[in-house]
């Protein structure tokens, strides 16, 4: 029972996860980060359901969240030496004796037939000698455990990389081609496809327990897409989302290792807010007013003004 009570503070004290500032895109990527960003992007794009566009010629419009940012992450891996440390110090008793020199002073006073002699003894204000005696034993004991990490959590400054956006756009075009959907310039298209990429970046985190430690790097890609028939203004694909994340993790014991390295790709949480539940206003007076009734199985159409704005015209 005593051993258990001693281990509980050791395991629970200073436990937590330090998460670095997320950054979109990135500057000079290292190989693992490239692999994760590519994996999450490919998985999200691959999940897009484009069956309604079979045999069509599509104009593709991709809008990506700004990929410029910077963060400063400082601090190294913690050392157990600061948490497990003890010492014992004992000094013997000490006594000091001081010897002050003494001197005599004689004063004689005469007046006619009378005279007097005064003698006094004084001590100097500074000792002539000092003697110190120690009694008892002197001892000093100390104990400690020091476990340092293999490196510091270095500073990061991530700059914009427009090639990330170009890479993602090319992936989307590749999937369209492999699905049998032709991507053409807007003037030759019969369908407009809009893809909005809300999340496209990496997140670093560190978990520090006394016995277990981990370094984790995640890459996330989250996007929303819909398609519009250019002639009828009908929604061929209502707003849908695709979200995936990839992860690289190194696990340590007392920052020794890593004893395990893992890579995973999985579906992540969807967008916090999407447009799948938006319907046209019932009292709109705009030209090409959508004809839409909830739960009637029909798809809303989209007016020319909406298309023009999405194109940036």
Curated annotation (Swiss-Prot):
Q: Does the keyword Glycoprotein apply?
A: no
Localization per record:
Cell outer membrane
Q: Which UniProt keywords are given for this protein, alphabetically ordered?
A: Cell adhesion, Cell outer membrane, Lipoprotein, Membrane, Palmitate, Signal, Virulence
Q: Where is this region: Disordered?
A: 282-313
Which terms does the UniProt entry file under GO BP? cell adhesion
Mention any additional remark: Present in outer membrane vesicle formulations which are used as vaccines in human.
What is this protein called in UniProt? Adhesin MafA
Q: Which organism is it from?
A: Neisseria meningitidis serogroup B (strain ATCC BAA-335 / MC58)
What gene codes for this chain? mafA1
């Amino acid at each position: 029972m005593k051993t258990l009570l001693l281990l509980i503070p050791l395991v629970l004290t200073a436990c937590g996860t330090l998460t670095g500032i997320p950054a979109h895109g990135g500057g000079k990527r290292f190989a693992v980060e490239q692999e994760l960003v590519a994996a999450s992007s490919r998985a999200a794009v691959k999940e897009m359901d484009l069956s309604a566009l079979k045999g069509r010629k599509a104009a593709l419009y991709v809008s990506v969240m700004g990929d410029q940012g910077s963060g400063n992450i400082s601090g190294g891996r913690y050392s157990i030496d600061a948490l497990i440390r003890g010492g014992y110090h004992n000094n013997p008793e000490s006594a000091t004796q001081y010897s002050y020199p003494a001197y005599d002073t004689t004063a004689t006073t005469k007046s006619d037939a009378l005279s007097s002699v005064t003698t006094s003894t004084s001590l100097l204000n500074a000792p002539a000698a000092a003697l110190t005696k120690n009694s008892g034993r002197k001892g000093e004991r100390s104990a400690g455990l020091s476990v340092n990490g293999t490196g510091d959590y270095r500073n990061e400054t991530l700059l914009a990389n427009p090639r990330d956006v170009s890479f993602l756009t090319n992936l989307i075009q590749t999937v369209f081609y492999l699905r049998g959907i032709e991507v053409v310039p807007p003037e030759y298209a019969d369908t407009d496809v809009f893809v909005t990429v809300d999340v496209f970046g990496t997140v670093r985190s560190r978990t520090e327990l006394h016995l277990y430690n981990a370094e984790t790097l995640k890459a996330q890609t989250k996007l929303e897409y819909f398609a519009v028939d250019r002639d009828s203004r009908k929604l061929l694909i209502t707003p849908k989302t695709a979200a995936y994340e990839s992860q690289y993790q190194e696990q340590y014991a007392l920052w020794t290792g890593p004893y395990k390295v893992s890579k995973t790709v999985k579906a992540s949480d969807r967008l916090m807010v999407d447009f799948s539940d938006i319907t046209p206003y019932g009292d709109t007076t705009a030209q090409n007013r959508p004809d839409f009734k909830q739960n009637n199985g029909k798809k809303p159409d989209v007016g020319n003004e909406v298309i023009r704005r999405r194109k940036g015209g």
